């Protein structure tokens, strides 16, 4: 295939990737302090690329769509007006179940740092 044919194929694949991405929005459970388990699901807006589950003290739970780059203790605590909490952010459909593993902010930061270091050394 000539360079023109390769360029056209790359262009078509790029358009297809964009169209496929536009057709799917993340789904998350969406409840605040449900009486039982949360079963209400919603489609997240285009700028919300994560689901979040929060357990706050005194007992209060949140299930929501969220922005992954805002998944940190300080932002969540300030935004939800909760001082003591555990949270889990995830990026798959309906992944914010109450039985999901809860990560503290420090654990999430450690995992991110290890991933960045591994990626850096592999390049």
UniProtKB/Swiss-Prot annotation:
Disulfide bonds: 28-51, 31-38, 44-65, 71-89, 90-95
Domain of life: Eukaryota
Location(s), subcellular: Cell membrane; Secreted
Membrane topology annotation: Lipid-anchor; GPI-anchor
Entry protein name: CD59 glycoprotein
Keywords, ordered alphabetically: Cell membrane, Disulfide bond, Glycoprotein, GPI-anchor, Lipoprotein, Membrane, Secreted, Signal
Taxonomic source organism: Sus scrofa
Positions annotated as propeptide: 99-123
GO BP terms in the entry: innate immune response; negative regulation of activation of membrane attack complex
Primary location group: membrane
Function recorded in the entry: Potent inhibitor of the complement membrane attack complex (MAC) action, which protects self-cells from damage during complement activation. Acts by binding to the beta-haipins of C8 (C8A and C8B) components of the assembling MAC, forming an intermolecular beta-sheet that prevents incorporation of the multiple copies of C9 required for complete formation of the osmolytic pore.
Any one GO molecular function term: complement binding
Signal peptide segment: 1-25
Lipid-modified residues, GPI-anchor amidated serine kind: 98
Quaternary context: Interacts with T-cell surface antigen CD2.
Tissues and organs where the protein is expressed, per its UniProt entry: Expressed in all tissues tested (lung, testis liver, kidney, spleen, heart and skeletal muscle). Highest levels in lung and spleen, lowest levels in liver and skeletal muscle.
InterPro entries in alphabetical order: CD59 (IPR056949), CD59_antigen_CS (IPR018363), LY6_UPA_recep-like (IPR016054), Snake_toxin-like_sf (IPR045860)
PROSITE patterns linked to this entry: LY6_UPAR
């Amino acid at each position: 295939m000539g360079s023109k044919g390769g360029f056209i194929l790359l262009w078509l694949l790029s358009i297809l990737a964009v169209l496929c991405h536009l057709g799917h929005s993340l789904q998350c459970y969406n409840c605040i302090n449900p009486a039982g388990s949360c079963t209400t699901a919603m489609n997240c807006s285009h700028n919300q690329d994560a689901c979040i589950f929060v357990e706050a003290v005194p007992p209060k739970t949140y299930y929501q769509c969220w922005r992954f780059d805002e998944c940190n203790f300080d932002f969540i605590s300030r935004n939800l007006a909760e001082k003591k909490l555990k949270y889990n952010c995830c990026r798959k459909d309906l992944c914010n179940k109450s039985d999901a593993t809860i990560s503290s902010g420090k654990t999430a930061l450690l995992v991110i740092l290890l991933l960045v270091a591994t990626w850096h050394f592999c390049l």
